[in-house]
């Protein structure tokens, strides 16, 4: 979310109107510091899912882009962000998973810490996150879509990965975005065999306080048993 300019950009009523089983947030809740979240907490804590609201950390959530006096101060900022999410009723999946049960079926929802190519941080541990999910349908939240080709496709059977990160570079004109030159998978649905990736382009902005064509979005995904 970061600096979205106004809390009106976040429509908790629109999200709740979907009556979702799960609400998932794939990272970069702030741009630099945990206090950016404070004005949005009254809205975000109203977002509900029948089976909960889950999140993962993105590269900005670690606050690596500002100068901290000490490593301890930076760590305290991250812990503050985690605490604020917990207070909102969100559960962060840091290289972990939960098992969800519906009508006799089980789905594994897993999440990893940011797993990016340099210079972005890589704290993700995919194998740890998936341990114990063998044979289940798996949804993986991983902030950076480059994780898909780097590790998820070659080393796992995750059926659906959900990412963010690209923001579509906040610009899209007639379907063209410069994000395509940096991220092969930068917006929407991608498939390789029986595995899929969906990249959501987020709500807020970074550096430039505007979006052109790459409008803020939420994504509604319906899973069908086949």
Q: Positions of the model-derived regions?
A:
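Acidic/histidine-rich helix-loop elements
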Residues: 6-7, 30-35, 63-76, 118-121, ...
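Core catalytic region of metal-dependent phosphoesterases/phosphodiesterases
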Residues: 11-101
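Short, conserved loop/helix-junction motifs that constitute active-site signature segments
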Residues: 18, 44-50, 131-134, 152-156
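Beta-strand-turn-beta hairpins that frame and shape the catalytic cleft
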Residues: 90-91, 97-109, 131-136, 191-196
């Amino acid at each position: 979310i970061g600096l979205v300019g106004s809390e009106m950009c976040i429509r908790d009523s629109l999200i709740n109107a979907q009556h979702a089983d799960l609400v998932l947030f794939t990272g970069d809740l702030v741009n630099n510091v945990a206090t950016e979240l404070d004005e949005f907490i009254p809205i975000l804590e109203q977002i509900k899912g029948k089976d909960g609201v889950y999140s993962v950390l993105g590269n900005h959530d670690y606050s690596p882009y500002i100068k901290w006096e000490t490593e301890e101060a930076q760590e305290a900022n991250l812990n503050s962000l985690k605490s604020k999410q917990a207070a909102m009723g969100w559960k962060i999946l840091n290289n972990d998973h939960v098992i969800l049960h519906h009508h006799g079926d089980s789905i594994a929802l897993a999440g990893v810490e940011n797993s990016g190519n340099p210079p972005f941080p890589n704290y993700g541990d995919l194998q740890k996150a998936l341990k114990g999910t063998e044979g289940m349908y798996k949804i993986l939240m991983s902030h950076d879509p480059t994780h898909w080709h780097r590790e998820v496709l070659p080393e796992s059977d995750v059926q659906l990965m959900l990412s963010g990160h690209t923001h579509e570079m906040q610009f899209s004109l007639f379907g063209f975005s410069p994000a395509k030159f940096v991220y092969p998978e930068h917006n929407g649905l991608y498939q390789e065999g029986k595995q899929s990736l969906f990249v959501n382009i987020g709500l807020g902005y970074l550096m430039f306080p505007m979006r052109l064509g790459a409008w803020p979005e939420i994504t509604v995904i319906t899973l069908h048993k086949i």
